[in-house]
């Protein structure tokens, strides 16, 4: 997995020690590409679903890039999870350019197999697809990797969703004291971890 690090300085912010980083893109690129990411099906025990919704993570990554406009699941006319279930007429009617479907299957204790397929809706053909073994711990990272593959396949540029970011938080403690922390997190702000805690300014990772 890629491990590129970026610095985000939270200047003047007062964050709780356990607060999560929220990354919000308020304006996407003009002409963002319409895409549908169908919620991934779970092929295992309904009472023991995977810890993360892979399709939701993929859609959120693509939306956050500003290059794509994912269709809301509520607007979908169907929710195929296998190639033979795809009726491209449904997606053409919704003016969707590309379609992502997939499923998750159990693979031994704590393991999963994630399969996904990317389609060109107007050509009515599969562009790419992968079967990816993973674990419960790495399932969200696998979803980011899927988003990277989709992004690069459709734009020709490498995705950065599976990278990590580094950022600094500042929390005031008392009148003249300040607690400063260097943290790392997933590119979407998930799973933050404190690397350094100090009462002195931290300007870089």
Language-model features, listed with the residues they occupy:
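Short beta-strand->alpha-helix linker/helix-N-cap micro-motif
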Residues: 24-89, 100, 104-106
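Sec/Tat signal peptide C-region and signal peptidase I cleavage site
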Residues: 15-19
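Multi-bladed beta-propeller domains
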Residues: 186-203
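Conserved beta-propeller blade repeats
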Residues: 138-139, 153-156, 199-205
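Residue position within the beta-strands of beta-propeller blades
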Residues: 101, 165-170
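Amphipathic beta-strand/beta-sheet edge segments enriched in Tyr/Trp
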Residues: 21, 82-149
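Sec-dependent N-terminal signal peptides
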Residues: 4-13
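Structural motif
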Residues: 109-113, 174-183
């Amino acid at each position: 997995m890629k491990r590129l690090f970026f610095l985000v300085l939270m200047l003047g912010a007062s964050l709780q020690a356990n607060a999560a980083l929220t990354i919000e893109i308020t304006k996407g690129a003009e002409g963002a590409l319409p895409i549908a990411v169908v919620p991934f099906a779970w092929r295992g025990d309904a009472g023991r679903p995977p810890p993360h919704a892979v399709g939701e993570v993929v859609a959120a990554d693509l939306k956050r890039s500003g290059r794509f406009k994912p269709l809301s699941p509520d607007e979908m006319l169907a929710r195929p999870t296998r190639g033979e279930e795809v009726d491209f007429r449904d997606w053409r009617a919704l003016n969707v350019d590309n379609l992502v479907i997939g499923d998750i299957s159990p693979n031994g204790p704590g393991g999963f197999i994630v399969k996904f397929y990317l389609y060109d809706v107007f050509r009515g053909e599969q562009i790419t697809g992968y079967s990816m073994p993973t674990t419960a711990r790495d399932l969200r990272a696998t979803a980011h990797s899927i988003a990277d593959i989709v992004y690069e396949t459709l734009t020709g540029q490498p995705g950065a969703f599976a990278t990590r970011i580094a950022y600094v938080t500042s929390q005031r403690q008392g009148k003249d004291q300040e607690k400063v922390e260097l943290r790392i997190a997933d590119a979407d702000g998930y799973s933050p971890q404190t690397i350094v805690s100090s009462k002195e300014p931290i300007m870089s990772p």
